[in-house]
Regions:
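Charged phosphate-binding loop/patch that engages nucleotide di/tri-phosphates or the phosphate backbone
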Residues: 84, 91, 95
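Short coil/turn motifs at secondary-structure junctions
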Residues: 76, 86-88
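Conserved binding/recognition cores within well-folded domains
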Residues: 1-80
Length: 95
């Protein structure tokens, strides 16, 4: 059983949903929206249609001139916020 504070991100790939931790990726028996609902009152935020990240595991954000946001996680994973979610993330960051 994974604890929410262990999870760096939750993502969908190939029709399956995975929780990524420092120890690897684990298959979840949930849809992404179900995982998002279960973690609604925590530090998790959706950054694209296929990914949710744990804000407590973010090492840094890199804003580019083109408006995209690159996210570096504590486990070394680098991912991007989709255009649809950029405004929401900027609001969370106070930008």
């Amino acid at each position: 059983v994974l604890e929410p504070n262990e999870i760096d991100r939750i993502y969908a790939s190939g029709g399956k949903v995975y929780a990524e931790t420092k120890n690897g990726a684990f298959l979840l028996r949930l849809r992404l929206y179900e995982a998002e609902q279960r973690l609604a009152n925590s530090s998790f935020v959706r950054i694209s249609n296929s990914e949710i990240i744990n804000l407590k595991k973010v090492r840094g954000f890199d804003l580019s001139f083109t408006g995209t946001i690159c996210v570096s996680l504590s486990n070394g994973t680098v991912t991007y916020v989709s255009r649809r979610y950029v405004a929401k993330i900027k609001q969370l960051l106070g930008l």
